[in-house]
Amino acid sequence: MKQLLFTLIAALGMGANAASLSLNDVLSEVPALDPSIPIPEAVTGVKVGERHWYHHEIVRYLNTLADASPRMVPLGEHAKSYGGRVLISYAISSPENLARLDEFKAARAAIIDPNADLELSEQPAVLHMMYSVHGNEASGANATPLVAYYLAATTDENLLSQLENVIIILNPMLNPDGLDRFANWTNAHRGINPSNDPNDREHTEAIPNGRTNYYWFDLNRDWLPHQHPESRGRLALFHEWKPNVQLDFHEQGSNSNFFFMPGKPERTNPLTPDINQILTAKIGEYHAQAFDAEGIRFFTEEGYDDFFMGKGSTYPDLFGTVGILFEQPSSRGAVQDTVNGKLTFPISISNQFRASLSSIKATAALKDNLLAYQRNFYTERKRKRGYYLASAEGDPTRLQEFVRILRGHQIEVEALTSDVTAEGKTFKAGETIAIPLAQPQATYLETLWREQLEFEENVFYDVSTWTLPWAFNLSHTRDAVTNAKTEAMSSSVDDDESKLGKSAIGYLIDWRDSASPALLYDLLEAGANVRVATAPFTALTTNEGSINFGYGTLFVAPKLQESIPQPVLSLLAEAQTEGLAIYPAASSYTPEGIDLGSRAFDVLSLPKVLMVTGPGTSAYGTGEIWHLLDRRLDMPLTMVDSNRLSRVNLDDYTHVITTTPVRLEGVSKQLESFIKDGGILWAQGASTVAWAADAGLATATWRETAQQVRKDSLQTAIERGDEALSQAELLPARKPFATASDEYAFTLVRGSILQGNLDISHPLGFGYASEALAVFRTTNRFMNPSDNAYSSPVVYTDSPLLSGYMSTENQTLAANSAGLVVNQLGKGAVILSLDSTTFRAFWWGSQRLLVNGIFFGSLLEEPR
């Protein structure tokens, strides 16, 4: 039996590399193994580490293993990726524990119930082991066949004893689409003699790479917003099992050493209990022992942190769970030269295997401490009173998505039944949600609502803030109110309200509702005559009487001498059934404002959008836009690689979107002609805005830091030969070299929320109920407003920082700077957007800016 495991471990090597791994590289002592348990290559025909395994191979082997072993059962499909790949998890424990699995699962809810009578000593700890949320960090997922095999086949008494005290939830891959994308790449770019040169094509993936999911999102940043099916499934799994420890297996730069938690202490989230970090350190002692025994170097307490509460290793910290991050140096393929020597894929797998076993040992040894911590987290904290209130005037769809996110975190949400005035705002019953602070998940609710401006350290691994009501641009209370009256929320639609009324005049659609854009595209595609109101008005309707309508209201009317076609009426009826309010007009005459026959209703046409992708572009930025158009607007998008753009006839499109500069010969002239002929260019990001200005497509001027001003002044003095102005006066003061990194970090903007002032009469501002707009900022470049008084629809306020870190100098530069500028060029326009309006797919508050640019681009020409 020893030979079986030796063969398995040796199979981790390839060719000449096999000799670098022996049985003792993974296990110091090899127990007898159950011969009835199939080894990986017996099922898939592929040895672990021989090449990168695909999703279906891992699932096939683990399912076979579960059939063969009494220590392993499948928990079923908890999600399906956009690419159609199922995500399956498995429970691994002693046969006795698995026989009582439903009982132990039910007890998980009792552990966090202060009124439950549960003997903790009789409960096993739950360990959630998650691998490869980044698909091209593949050693984690590729380790799971080996981990599961050893747990199923071992006769080691110590490990069997550990399984009596631990239920393992094995989540073998969190990102199957990215995993397969990377497996396809690396397996297709290696021969029988793999290259260890870091410059080799195998080690430098094309864009998009395997890190991201189907729509090119980082799924490890999707725990908080859970916009994608993989995240929603794993979130449900997490709350179903309420683990005591959650493991998050990653890879990092090839020249690093292995990392495990704890992270940098100064960057721990202030809501994380101290005991959490103590337990993290205790668990770390078991990893240290395992890695020291093999002479494997590692590091802790630097580089990575526990601040952003939306990653796999930090999210659990606010639910009574201990989150642990592992970072293995990556071979990014079969083998790669590093400063530490030749790093092979098998070595990476063996370290993930080793960390898996040390985690099981630690969880079993600390079972009582972990269970007590989890119970105390929920039963001993001080309970707060009151409710947070939030509303989205005129946009129930946006509010419903906000509620969905909260409920995904098991946060209770209720409906306000009586109007409340608080913090200078009136919150109306029937339109406002109320979130009670007195609930089990109050801690995570607090981090979602929290606004933070003061920080112990100003260096961040990820973003510095994530205030959810600002992401949705909701009218909300910053503090809890105690005078709210509430009831359970209802999600049903009144049958009478779901029936489309008849009108010979036409139908009005409130553009404020986030469900309206998808309907608009369908209407235009169906050939409907759709117009948009460029001024507010009050109209008479057949179903609701007199109704006030704002900028951007859609008017679906019959064409001359025709009635509205039945396919168009069917689209309207279906939208009404799904909850979107459709108002049949009773008359073209309006009591106030423009009449329905006014020339202030502009005719809309079907947009045809091209987005620049591929070499040189950002997968994140383009993926966010692709997801918005494809999944939310339900409209097609043409994606063209940057190196092919010059060969595309842009006359076939109404819009070109780029999130990166396109510095290729002839492209600027091509785009200039496109814009002058009526096209719209959406240029997103500071470097893209600068490129558009440099290319002569737009005008943008920048605000300068004090250092930039000094540099410019020095250059001017040198050019003029001004001897009276000495360099000593203009050069920066001398500073210690060791402070350079921190000084640079202070200048960065790593995810802050700024308060913008929005012109809601501008076509890009149509559908907003308020001029206040919260924008997510990730760049430290600041743009001046346009010298055209009508062309800066978003300008930041004079004190714009709502939450997050931003240096004093950057705050000064941000004040009254522009977030969005429109440049007219011929019949078309260039829209300059410094910020991502669709950040991580959950910044619903600002995504409408891009949507408006797509549908209302023809309205951007300044009226004469």
Identify what each model region corresponds to.
Residues 6-15:
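Bacterial N-terminal signal peptides
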Residues 173-175, 186, 249-257, 687:
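Short, solvent-exposed turn/loop segments enriched in Gly/Ser/Thr/Pro and often Arg
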Residues 184-203, 224, 228-231, 243, ...:
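Active-site cavity-forming subdomains of large catalytic enzyme subunits
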Residues 19-138, 142-166, 215, 221-222, ...:
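Intrinsic-disorder/low-complexity accessory segments
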Residues 148, 165-188, 193-194:
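Carboxylate/His-rich catalytic cores and anion/metal-binding grooves
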Residues 199-217:
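Aromatic- and acidic-residue-enriched carbohydrate-binding clefts of CAZyme catalytic domains
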Residues 1-4:
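Positively charged n-region of N-terminal signal peptides that target proteins for export
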Residues 130-131, 171-173, 246-249, 684:
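Active-site neighborhood of phospho(di)ester-bond hydrolases with catalytic His/Asp-centered motifs
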